[in-house]
Amino acid sequence: PKQPQEQPKEEPDKLTVEIPRKLMNDTALANLDRIIEGKSTLIRKAIGADSLEYEITEDRIRFPWFTMTEDAEENKAYITFISKLAEQARTAKRVTLKDKPVDNEKYAFRCFLLRLGFIGEEYKEARKILLKNLTGNGAWKNGGDR
């Protein structure tokens, strides 16, 4: 999903989240690719992105995935998501995710967010924002059927 680019172009309705290139070595970038590939369907739907390509410049990694919003909490949720995604890619020993259909999108993505570290009251609003575009029940894998 990476796409080298010399001159970054800003789109007025896009929010681009950037991280320093020096934070991600080649192994971390490979892990990032696998994580994104493994959750691409859910990530795209959750954030409303058409593409999950990221751009690498000499000193930055840019994620132009998000739609600009006036809501500071929503922007913060997107920034935190990229930060946690990069952190997972840096610290993971191995990544073996396959993008597969899920019956309950909201539950599957909530579990993914928890694995990324969106745990506790401080991330409650971010989880809510990142889950709002998905279908299903976030609390129960089978939608509450037991």
What do these predicted ranges mean?
Residues 1-146:
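Long, charge-dense low-complexity segments
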